Regions:
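C-terminal catalytic lobe of FAD-dependent flavoproteins
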Residues: 3-59, 65-182
Length: 182
């Protein structure tokens, strides 16, 4: 997760990768359409933008902005970006304003970059891969997982199980599917 760099610094672990952070936010607003379909658009910055039905509410977003820290919060600029984009793309009876925001969600995406000394700022931020990287130290039996997406967690888990086995930890049944199957 986003704290592996801090963990590695505290334990003295040297790795080939590190993180840069992309902050994403979503706003929860009253239901904006009677339909229960996810709406997708391209935002002004060219990335995908969503309106996701949530019972009597709609989750709208997201942003993709650089963050220096895994600790983040919604800024006025973030909020306005989301409101402006949804208002431009839907012909609502009344445009959404800050007063319509019921709740806000904010987090960072840990993006993996090489630890070669470059800070990742010279790369096209929106084109950076959301893939993961794994650094292992067999001498200390240390595994660091960088980047990745929740939707790929099963594959990452299988990969990590392989590294754990390589380090001499006997897995109870390597053929057993561990992700919710009986």
């Amino acid at each position: 997760g986003p704290f592996v760099d801090e963990h590695n610094a505290r334990t003295g672990e040297k790795t080939a990768h590190r993180h840069v952070f992309s902050k994403g936010i979503h706003l929860i607003v009253p239901q904006i359409t009677p339909h229960r379909r996810v709406l997708t658009f391209f935002a002004d910055d060219g990335r995908l933008f969503f309106a996701i039905p949530m019972d009597q509410h709609t989750c709208v977003g997201t942003t993709d902005t650089r963050s220096e820290s895994p600790f983040s919060e919604v800024t006025d600029e973030d909020r306005q970006f989301v409101l402006d984009n949804i208002n431009k793309r839907l012909n609502l009876k009344k445009p959404l304003t800050r007063d319509d925001v019921i709740a806000e969600r904010c987090g960072v995406r840990p993006l993996v970059v090489s630890n070669s000394g470059k800070d990742g700022n010279d790369r096209d931020w929106l084109q950076m891969s959301r893939k993961h990287a794994v650094d292992t130290n067999h001498d200390t039996c240390h595994i660091s997982i960088f980047g990745g997406k929740l939707t790929d967690c099963v594959n990452v888990g299988n990969e990590i199980a392989g590294y754990v086995a390589e380090m001499g930890v006997a897995l109870p049944d390597p053929e057993c599917k561990w992700y919710g199957e009986p």
